[in-house]
């Protein structure tokens, strides 16, 4: 979905349409693009807040309510979103409640020279193959394979010590005064319990990708920036000093010891 300033909530969730049949007129719900396995919300912060909030129920409750009726989302449902820098024209800040519902916030910067050269080569190769048959395209991943992978990740072992380390990291964002300056001057609002859940899920996923059946502090530290950077609200003092969320998380990682 391309998010634009004139987008309406019904363009996302769908709407009831009046149909004339032999038995008379009736309303029928026409599903919107949100009813898909993988939803890409492109430039999400170009749309007004009321459209952004249309995603909230679907992302958290896995359902959409239209005209008093509830419609369930598919079992396999994920939302990816891109956003423009807030200083660009025509952008709206995402509400904290919506940001908190995203599992991770991945920062994508400009590629280095070598990677940009590979991008040019890849694009050139793809353009050269367009007139050819699509027989060589990779097969789609069966949904069951994704469900099986999720089940394996759910079985990754998390020790009490690893869990305590995750909780300590989250509590450091909520009670930075326990760690003194400068941390207590930088954080205005810390991570919610969704931050703890995200850290746990992503650490287990990272352990699974690394071929391990248990979570270590290294797994937790490797995902904590992506899990927490969008959940912290920094103080005016931090912003005025040019301190960003990643620097705050780095400071937390250096102060909170792994058991």
Summary of predicted features, one role per range:
Residues 53, 100, 117, 160-167, ...:
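Non-catalytic, well-ordered alpha-helical scaffold segments
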């Amino acid at each position: 979905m391309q998010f634009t300033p004139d987008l309406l909530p019904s363009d996302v969730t769908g709407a009831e349409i009046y149909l004339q049949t032999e038995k008379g007129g009736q309303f029928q719900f026409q599903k919107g693009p949100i009813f898909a396995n993988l939803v890409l919300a492109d430039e999400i912060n170009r749309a007004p807040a009321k459209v952004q909030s249309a995603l909230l129920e679907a992302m958290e409750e896995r359902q959409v309510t239209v005209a008093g009726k509830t419609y369930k989302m598919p079992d396999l449902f994920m939302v990816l979103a891109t956003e423009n820098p807030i200083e660009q024209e025509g952008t709206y800040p995402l509400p904290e409640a919506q940001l908190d519902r995203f599992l991770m916030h991945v920062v994508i910067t400009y590629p280095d020279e070598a990677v940009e050269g590979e991008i040019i080569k890849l694009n050139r190769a793809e353009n050269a193959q367009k007139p050819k048959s699509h027989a060589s395209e990779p097969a789609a991943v069966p949904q069951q394979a994704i469900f099986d992978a999720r089940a394996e990740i759910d079985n990754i072992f998390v020790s009490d010590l690893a869990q305590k380390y995750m909780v300590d990291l989250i509590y450091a964002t909520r009670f930075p005064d326990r760690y003194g300056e400068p941390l207590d001057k930088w954080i205005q609002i810390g991570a919610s319990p969704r931050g703890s859940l995200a850290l746990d899920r992503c650490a287990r996923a990272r352990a699974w990708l690394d071929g391990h059946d248990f979570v270590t502090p290294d797994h937790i530290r490797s995902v904590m920036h992506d899990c927490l950077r969008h959940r912290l609200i920094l103080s005016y003092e931090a912003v005025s000093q040019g301190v960003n969320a990643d620097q705050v998380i780095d400071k937390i990682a250096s102060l909170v010891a792994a058991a």
